[in-house]
Each structure stands twice: as C-alpha cells, then as structure tokens.
Amino acid sequence: MQILLHLITRKLGYCIPMRYGFLVHTYETERLKVLGVWSMFRDEDLPFRPHPSDTRGLSVLEQMRHQCQSENAFFCRMLGIDVGAPPLPLDETRRGFVLQYGTDSLKRLDVLRSKTDDAWWEEEVAFFDVMRSRAWILVRRIAHTSHHRGQQMAMLRMLNREVFSVYGPTADTGKQIVYTPALSE
C-alpha cells in the first residue's frame, strides 16, 4: 500500500510523507482557492451582500473577516497551531485580506507539514463540546472554508464578474485556466 501511495503522489506531482499528508495537501490547495476567489473581488465589492435588506447573508467583507477569524480560532484552540499574528489585517481592503490570510495560512501549512506523526493527527482534542481527532477537525475546517468560498463565487456572479477557474475548469471559463491572484488591481 505504501508503494502504491508513493506512486500515486508522485504521479500527481506532490509527495506525501505521512498517512495524513492528503489533508495537508487539501488544505494547501484550499487556501490557494480562497486567495484566488478573494483576488477576483474589487474593494468596492466588499459591502455587497446577497440581498441588500437581508443581513443574514454576510457581505463580502464579513465573509473575509469570518474566514480569517474562524480559521485562526480553529487552528489555535483545536489544533494547537498559533501563527502569532492577529487574524485580521490592519488595512481591511481586498489586498489587505489577501496578504494577511496568505501569510497566516502559509504559516499554518508549514506547521501542518511538520506533523508527520500519525499519533498527532489521531489524538482526540476538544471540538467545541465534543472530542474529535485532529484529522477530523481539519476535514471540518476545509469543508467550512469550501462552503464560504462557494458563497463568495455566487456573489461574484451576482456582481456580473468573471469567475476564473481556481482549480481546474469552470462553466465560466470553458477551459483550464490557473488563476493567479493579482494584488495590483
């Protein structure tokens, strides 16, 4: 099985030196997807919400704040990974959020890459009021992030923006385009 896993990971272009490496790789790609989607917004889009009179639907700015704060809380409280930085940027612009989240999530990724002992991933720790393994918690974190990223992509469409492919083709592009966040726009 180890040989097969090694061959598969080599074929895909990345190496997973541990049983839970697939979770590290998934977090790595998810953070890039978030950064790609955020970079497609404009600063004037930040107050936009799905329906102007319904405050239950978070604005783009509130979504960015939530992502930064909730991911920081998950990693600090549940996974024991603190990057030693405030979760929100001083400059709450699109660029500020992309830079802050990009920096902090890369630090988290580096720590996750260092967790090569299966026991760390399998240890049960507090997930709110229940005990769960760290692997389970990271899966929940990734799913939560993906859910909000989908909402943000829907808001880009409501704003009549082009939605570039952040990981493979989408209906908007019709072909494979890897979108690189443009911080200078």
Please identify what each model-predicted range represents:
Residues 13, 24, 28-35, 46-89, ...:
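Short, contiguous alpha-helical
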Residues 19-24, 94-98, 139-142:
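Active-site rim elements
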Residues 77, 81-115:
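Helix-adjacent hinge/juxtasegments
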Residues 42, 113-116, 156:
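A structural signal for long alpha-helical coiled-coils and helix-turn connectors
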Residues 27, 31, 38, 101, ...:
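Hydrophobic alpha-helical core bundles mediating ligand binding, dimerization, or RNAP-core interactions
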Residues 1-17:
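N-terminal amphipathic/basic-hydrophobic helices that include classical n-h-c signal peptides
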Residues 113-128:
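Acidic catalytic patch
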